[in-house]
Amino acid sequence: MDASSIPQINIEDFDGLEVAPDDHLRNLKALTEKLRLETRRPSYLEWKERVEAQNTKGLAVSDGSTELEKDAGLKPRATPQRTIEDSQMTAGNGLISRSLGGFDNIDEALVWLRKELMEMRIQDQQLARQLMRLRGDINKLKVEQTCHLHRRMLNDATFGLEERDELSDLLCDGPVTPGFGLSSPLRLIGVTKMNINSRRFSLC
């Protein structure tokens, strides 16, 4: 059978294409690799172990049969070319007796498969967008919580200084010391109003 008459299947390579800005699935994969995240879902782990076991078993059976054929002095089995050509000619003439999963021909099966893959990709994009949005919301809440905590710390320090100034005014009528009313031990370690208000705390 002429090789030129065999239909060729063109597979598009999307790895070399530029990533679209709204490709949420690609962004999610990049973020997962950056954070080195791995799924620990039991169903996925079981499926992965089952696939690896099947691959290992298939390789072992193939290697074992090859070794037996070599020991027996036999040539490796090969599919007869005539059988392949007959099957291709039968498929080309439309004389296939078995059905293609309920489809009339291979074109309908490919159209249905392409449609299913497109719907799955859309669902994956939606799920990836939701996950990225959820991560952004979590980071935003963390920042807001940190700012709220720093604001409370700053307010507590400010109220403490105001109370100290009021007590010093009530208990002592002497002149204000150069250390902004703070005691000498606090001045020695660098605790002043300037440090508390602008150095040790932040309003984000």
UniProtKB/Swiss-Prot annotation:
Coiled-coil stretches noted in the UniProt entry, renumbered to this chain: 113-146
PANTHER family from the UniProt entry: PROTEIN FAM167A (PTHR32289:SF3)
Organism: Danio rerio (Zebrafish)
UniProt record similarity statement: Belongs to the FAM167 (SEC) family.
The keyword Coiled coil appears for this protein: yes
Region (Disordered): 58-80
Superkingdom of origin organism: Eukaryota
Transmembrane segments: none
Disulfide-bond pairs as recorded: none
Protein name according to UniProt: Protein FAM167A
Keyword Coiled coil part of the UniProt annotation: yes
Keyword annotations of the record: Coiled coil
InterPro entries linked to this entry: FAM167 (IPR024280), FAM167_domain (IPR051771)
Alphabetical list of Pfam families matching this protein: FAM167 (PF11652)
